[in-house]
Amino acid sequence: MQIIDDKVLLVRTPDPKPIISQIKKSALLETHNGVSKVAIHWGMKEARMLAAMNAPNVPSPILRDYAWTGRLTPFEHQKSTASFLTLHDKAFCFNEQGTGKTASVIWAADYLMKRGEVSRVLILCPLSIMDSAWRQDLFKFAMHRSCSVAHGTAKQRAKIIKAGSEFVAINFDGLAVVEEEIVNGGFDLIVVD
């Protein structure tokens, strides 16, 4: 898949019909030796549709539109991970330990928040990394976002969740004691770490 002028995705495929019939902003350019070239508008909707068709290596518009926030410049594999995460409603990230998965997730969530697709993120993780990994990394990579760690008594956790931080980290054991608050908390993105 090739990006042309930051506007168009050029796809080479043996069967252009599924793309042309499902993606309105697409056009068949040519067919030669059984391979068709299809031009597709490079928007989030179109990229998600291509990803849903299992097209390989679909780039998300995050690569073009996002100003990578924070104190560190992302590596290409972090950009690729964030791109992948923005294209799928549900996704697993099995990158190796120490490759910057947390930063990639933060950037993907921040981008979706800037697009108005996500308003609050619930992070389920072990107690040992709620602060050291999530709160600290949120400050490092998206210091403009609010983050709270929901820990303590049930009353304290409920108060923290109701306070409205954009990112809330809670440990797995803490879920049961504030289930109602979480269900009613307006979380539209959930990260399980």
Residue ranges and their predicted role:
Residues 95:
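The Walker A (P-loop) glycine that initiates the GxxxxGKT/S ATP-binding motif of P-loop NTPases
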Residues 16-24, 30-31, 45, 55-83, ...:
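SF2 helicase/translocase NTPase motor core
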Residues 1-52:
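N-terminal accessory interaction module
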